[in-house]
């Protein structure tokens, strides 16, 4: 099974270090391509990365 993680950086190495999840709505990363996972604050937009 492929693992999906929410990341704000484009580099895969940084995404592997930290996993981000949406605590308010309890949403995980999307499973369809690269859609938005959860929004935190104003400047940060987390997207779904597949590894």
UniProtKB/Swiss-Prot annotation:
Disulfide partners: 7-15, 38-48
Keywords from the named record: Chromosome, Developmental protein, Differentiation, Disulfide bond, DNA condensation, DNA-binding, Nucleosome core, Nucleus, Phosphoprotein, Spermatogenesis
Any GO BP annotation: chromosome condensation
CC annotations in GO: male germ cell nucleus; nucleosome; nucleus
Compartmental location: Nucleus; Chromosome
Classification via Pfam families: Protamine_P1
Protein origin, superkingdom: Eukaryota
InterPro entries on file: Protamine_P1
Similarity comment text for this entry: Belongs to the protamine P1 family.
Name of the protein this chain belongs to: Sperm protamine P1
Gene symbol of the encoding locus: Prm1
């Amino acid at each position: 099974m492929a693992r999906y993680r929410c990341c704000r950086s484009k580099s895969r190495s940084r995404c592997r270090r930290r996993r981000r999840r949406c605590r308010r709505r309890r949403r995980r990363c999307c499973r369809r391509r690269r859609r938005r996972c959860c929004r935190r604050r104003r400047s940060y937009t987390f997207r779904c990365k597949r590894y």
